[in-house]
Amino acid sequence: MRRNGALLLMAVLAACGETPPPCSSPDNAGSAPSAGCLVWDARGALLVKDWSGEWALPGGSVNASESPRCGAEREVFEETGLIARAGDLAIVFDNGFHLYWCGVPASAEPRIHRPLEVADVTWWNLEALPDGTWRYPGQGAMIRELILARLEAPAD
């Protein structure tokens, strides 16, 4: 039992100490208190669940030395282990949270990268997005609306 506890502690500490990759576009343009990514591809929307049981998009606080775009990419890595590339700005919320459309490699699979913060990380298809268990009220409906609008938009 003691050996299993020591192995778990080593795994937690190793994941927390991993350095995020460099930002894909370190432009340092703009500022925001927080940012995140809406990663949507053939697998669905990438969501994280915290230990209270609530789902959310990967995201969090932006460091003083980084742009919102870089903060969004870093947060995806910290929470899911995936290397994301932030693209277009999807929306800025009233609280200043910047949400970007982000891509990850098609072969990459998410993993719980911060086990003290994240209880689960997975892909959800549009029809199966969980109802009523969101960190922020109305977030599930907002994600559906953003994805549907993007799918219906004419290609450039």
PLM feature spans:
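Acidic, metal-coordinating catalytic segment for phosphate/diphosphate chemistry
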Residues: 17-35
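Bacterial N-terminal signal peptides
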Residues: 5-14
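Unchanged
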Residues: 61-142, 146-153
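Entry beta-strands of beta-propeller and related beta-repeat scaffolds
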Residues: 44-45
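Short loop/turn segments immediately following the C-termini of beta-strands
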Residues: 50
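A short gly/proline-enriched turn/hairpin at secondary-structure junctions
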Residues: 56-60
